[in-house]
Structures are given as C-alpha cells and as structure tokens.
Swiss-Prot record:
GO terms for biological process: cortical microtubule organization; DNA repair; negative regulation of DNA-templated transcription; regulation of unidimensional cell growth. Interacts with ATH1, BLH1, BLH2, BLH3, BLH4, BLH5, BLH10, KNAT1, KNAT3, KNAT4, KNAT5, KNAT7 and KU70. Induction: By the DNA-damaging agents methyl methanesulfonate (MMS) and menadione. Residues 92-111 have a biased composition (Low complexity). It comes from Arabidopsis thaliana. InterPro entries: DNA_bnd_dom_ovate, Ovate, Ovate_C. This is Transcription repressor OFP1. Residues 25-116, 181-200 are annotated as: Disordered. Expressed in roots, xylem of stems, flower buds and siliques. Transcriptional repressor that regulates multiple aspects of plant growth and development through the regulation of BEL1-LIKE (BLH) and KNOX TALE (KNAT) homeodomain transcription factors. Controls the subcellular localization of the homeodomain protein BLH1. Plays a role in the regulation of cell elongation by controlling the expression of GA20OX1, a gene that encodes a key enzyme in gibberellin biosynthesis. May play a role in double-stranded DNA repair through the DNA non-homologous end joining (NHEJ) pathway along with KU70 and KU80 protein complex.
C-alpha cells in the first residue's frame, strides 16, 4: 500500500462480517478467562499498536459483556468512526509488521556469497559466446573467393557492309572517303514514276561518280519503264535529294545526256 493513501477495513469487508468478528472476540474472551497462562501471550498478539502521527485514534471504549445469541439483522447499522479507525490501525499495523518481517526474512535469506559480480559471467566467456559467430563469419568472408569470370557471348550487331564497301572491292591505290557519292538504286520493279520515291537508296563507294550515276539512272528507267516527262523529273529530284550539293552538277549533266538519248523533248524552262 502507498504511504499517502490507505484502504479502510470497512471498505474491504461487508458490514455483516463485523458482527461475526465481534462474536468471535467474545468467545475468545471466555477462553482467555479459563486459561490465564495463554491470555498473556494472546494479549500481546492482539495488542493494539501505538497510533502513528498520520492515523489519530480515539480512546478504545470498554466492551460490555453480553450473552445474547441473537443472529445479526439483515441490515445492521454501520459502526462508529472510532471503531473504523481502530480496525484501520490494526490492519495497518499488521501489514507493516508483516512487510517488515518479510523484508527481514528476504534480506536475511541473501547470503554474502551470492553477489552480482560472482553471478555474472566473466568477460572472456561473454566475448567468446557473443563474438564467436561473428568472428567465424568474418573468417569466412576473409577466405571467400570470388567466382570465376563468366564468358559472355559476343554481341552480334548488324554489319554495315551494304552501306560501305571495303578498300578490297575498290581498285588498287584508291582510298575510300567519307564524302563518297551516294547513288540511288531501286530494289523494287514498279512501273510508276512514284516508285522511284519509294525505292531504297544504297550508298556505295565510287571511283567514277559520273559513270555510276548514269548506270544507276538507266537501270531505274529500264526497270520502271519511265517515259513520261513528269516521272523523269521526279527521278531527278530523288537523286538530288539523296546526294550532297557537290554532286548535283554531275547528276544534272548525266540526266541531260540520258534525256537526249531517249529522244525526248527538252523540259519546260522555269
């Protein structure tokens, strides 16, 4: 129980029990009168302790002997405050004495041999028990060998052999340059002039650009059977768009020569 607040005995035990306790005390008094030797010890046991400063007690009223054996009423009146304080003091004193005895027995039970420094494990055993798995793990990681390098397959990429030819295919003594002419070659045999726009352009290295342009144009005209002036103009526009400005003069000269070979009327001057 706390030091500030203490429970009352009247709060813990119902009122009917007080009358039973009173009858029990009366029967004990009769036994005490018959046995004078045991009364002294029992009086010491049931003696009321001195009241503390926190719990003032009223003087204990003398009990009147009554030999009535009537049963307690169903609704007995509550006892006075003096009796409550007396019972409270007895309960508090009993609890204090029992707690004191328990503490003394508990403290007495502890022998000086059982100390904290002897109960705890030594440092070496603790370090060995706790750090042994860690040390084993560290040793394992120290001796860990990495797996062998995996042999990866070579990455297959599309070769640009169709876009650019090597120097072996070109005549000896001629170097390929980045600015080689691009010649439009048709990969489909369509019979309309618009097929020249949809045809695929192939970039190849050329030593004689004029001759290569002429062969390519004649092949396109023969495959697509181009004869109309509008289709030929579209073919010329395709060649000019596919090639850089430095080859435009060569393309125009080749186109004029083919135009004359086909015996076509001259194009309308703009």
């Amino acid at each position: 129980m706390g030091n500030n607040y203490r429970f009352k005995l009247s709060e813990l035990i119902p009122n009917a029990w007080f009358y039973k306790l009173r009858d029990m005390s009366k029967s004990k008094k009769k036994n005490l009168q018959s046995q004078p030797n045991s009364t002294t010890s029992k009086k010491k046991h049931h003696a009321v302790p001195t009241p503390t400063s926190t719990t003032p007690l009223s003087p204990r009223p003398p009990r009147r002997p009554s030999h009535s054996s009537k049963a307690p009423p169903s609704h007995p009146p509550r006892k006075s405050s003096g009796n409550r304080l007396r019972h409270r003091a007895t309960v508090d004193s009993k609890s204090s004495t029992t707690s004191g005895d328990s503490t003394t027995t508990e403290t007495g039970s502890f022998s000086p041999d059982f100390r904290s420094d002897q109960v705890l494990l030594p440092d070496e055993s603790l370090t060995g028990s706790w750090h042994s798995p860690c040390s084993s793990k560290l040793s394992k990681t120290a001796t860990f060998t990495p797996p062998p390098e995996l042999e990866l397959r070579p990455i297959i990429t599309k070769t640009a052999a169709t876009a650019r030819k090597t120097a072996v295919n070109s005549p000896a003594g001629v170097r390929l340059r980045m600015r080689s002419p691009r010649i439009s070659v048709s990969s489909s045999a369509r019979r309309s002039g618009s097929s020249a726009r949809r045809s695929r352009a192939v970039v190849k290295a050329s030593v004689d650009p004029k001759r290569d342009f002429k062969e390519s144009m004649e092949e396109m005209i023969a495959e697509n059977k181009i004869r109309a002036t509008k289709d030929l103009e579209e073919l010329l526009a395709c060649y000019l768009c596919l090639n850089s400005d430095e080859y435009h003069a060569i393309i125009i000269n080749v186109f004029k020569q083919i135009w004359l070979d086909l015996n076509l009327p001259p194009p309308h001057s703009k």
